[in-house]
Amino acid sequence: MANSASAIKRIELNERNRLRNKTYKSMLKTYYKKCIVAIETTNNNDLETSNLRELVAITQSKIDKAVQKGIIHSNNGSAKKAKLTKRLKEKKISL
């Protein structure tokens, strides 16, 4: 256990940040999974495609924000965005 007051404060701060990052990562995974499911189940009609475009844009924005905040590594964020784009291209859906 930490002896100094600053070390104790740092432990509390680290725990608070860990919990915040955990919730953000969980939200990010949820958006990513929703996006993958939406891509796989789309029928290329106009309404579904527009909703899908919006969902992909939101997901990519959330990934970028997670990278900016240091929650995920930049390479991890780039890989996630590339996988989304690859799945869209396989389904022949343009953004």
Swiss-Prot record:
Keyword tags: Chloroplast, Plastid, Ribonucleoprotein, Ribosomal protein, RNA-binding, rRNA-binding
Positions of the UniProt region annotated as Disordered: 76-95
GO molecular function: small ribosomal subunit rRNA binding; structural constituent of ribosome
An example Gene Ontology biological process: translation
Chief localisation class: plastid
Protein purpose: Binds directly to 16S ribosomal RNA.
Family: Belongs to the bacterial ribosomal protein bS20 family.
Protein's name in the database: Small ribosomal subunit protein bS20c
The species this protein was found in: Guillardia theta
